[in-house]
Amino acid sequence: MNQIKRIMAIDPWKIKSDTLEIEDRRLQESLTAIGNGYMGMRGNFSETYSGDSHQGFYLAGVWYPDKTRVGWWKNGYPEYFGKAINALNIAKINLNIDEVEVDLAVDPISNFTLALDMQKGTLSYGYDVRGVRVSAERFFSADVRELAVFKFGFEALDDQAHYIRIASVIDADVKNEDANYDEQFWQVLDQANQSQGSYLATQTIANPFGIEQFTVVASQSFAGDFEGLEQATAERSVTDVYGTVLKPETSLIFEKRVVVTTSRDYADLAAVIAGNAAIVSEKVIDQAYQQLYQAQVTAWAKRWELADVVIEGADAAQQGIRFNLFQLFSTYYGEDERLNIGPKGFTGEKYGGATYWDTEAYAVPLYLSLADQQVT
């Protein structure tokens, strides 16, 4: 009998590993995807990773009608396939230690850790490189649905001072791996560097099928111990650069907070930008990390209070049932009646992110029992 290939450790509440799986990196990314029903992403590193990977960030209800590729014999075949498309790379940073960029696929790293905490809805990873311990933690807020938080910690491991430089990027130069004609589905409408950070406004490209074009605005603001150095805009990206010296026996924190708004909730580009700015000023900029984090933990605790299934004496089964519930609730929790249950959640592009009748038929009873009645 074939043995199960297990790349993640068994733990009742976590999907975790102490190995960076170069050969199975895509699988690791799928297993550590997170979301909040409004948006989500695969478990990609924020830092540069030049190895094989599938970068993916998705917004629920934001899609594009990709023209089908089909031979002449397929009479009656649909003209397009609706896809929940890869939106922006909002997690991206270029991390330099002592003027050399960190590439996790190339650099010799040690003490690697990776953990999706399903109880709290957070993903964390860490590693040692060039005399520095790097610790990353992220979550897609279950309290402020438009907010994703990325925190990076740096701890000196030797008696040397290290210069840490971080270029934080929002990048629209993204693709869908399953695009039928290798098209990029996004065009940039607007971009700006501001006192608190930067924003990038994009729109899905025009299509010949009369389907609406979606506008998406992503902004980044920052907190922590780093000094702002410079800002830049490029054709398809915005960048904010921060840096400081990490002294021996000390530690530093850098926070990247991303707010994403779309034309699903606002009338036009100006309104999407204004709505984004309002969320940043009213709900994000003055909040300490611990406040944002605690709101996340509290929101997920309420979900688990209703939904948790306890299995004694079988940790693998316990992990499995919680993983399924976590991914379901990360995908859809009923807050937006316009949305539905994507069969693969925010783990990637399989099935185009569309919902199928069998997903509905089998999942609705679960949601009726474990979420608010308005879920349907």
Where are these regions (language model features)?
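Carboxylate/His-rich catalytic cores and anion/metal-binding grooves
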Residues: 314-322, 363-376
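Short, surface-exposed helix-loop/turn micro-motifs enriched in polar/charged residues
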Residues: 338, 354, 374-375
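Acidic/polar, glycine-enriched structural segments that form the non-catalytic walls/loops
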Residues: 2-350
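Segments forming glycine/polar-rich beta-alpha architectures that bind adenosine-containing cofactors
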Residues: 348-354, 359-360, 365
